[in-house]
């Protein structure tokens, strides 16, 4: 889940609404349907491999009802809730020794900043994030510029 969030910049709600048929590992993309809008988000090899492992191992352990199409499920094999995801995230943070509060949106923010750092154009990032207004996406270059200024002054 964390790999998918970071690799795509999806919102947690978008990820939790994914169905198995929304993921195409052969061609490396995820179809995100949120608020009546559909967007196709590419995923790279690390994310594809993580998704393959999840689908072949963890999901098959939890899901007993073959009619269940939710991509991410809880231990009972039902679609995972936001609260359930929050517990998973908190557990990973604790395991990693992270003491500060961690928010799922941090992964979305990191995705956008890292895409821009590595040469993606802002319009492409806007489309992948699903922002209808470019001004929402323009916050990320400001964050990136602020980070670079902080790095060079240190």
Model-derived regions: residue spans:
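N-terminal core-binding DNA-recognition domain of tyrosine site-specific recombinases/integrases
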Residues: 40, 79-83, 101-103
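Short functional hotspots where side chains directly engage DNA or cofactors
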Residues: 28-33, 103, 114, 126-144
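Major-groove DNA-contacting interfaces characterized by cationic-aromatic clusters
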Residues: 48-87
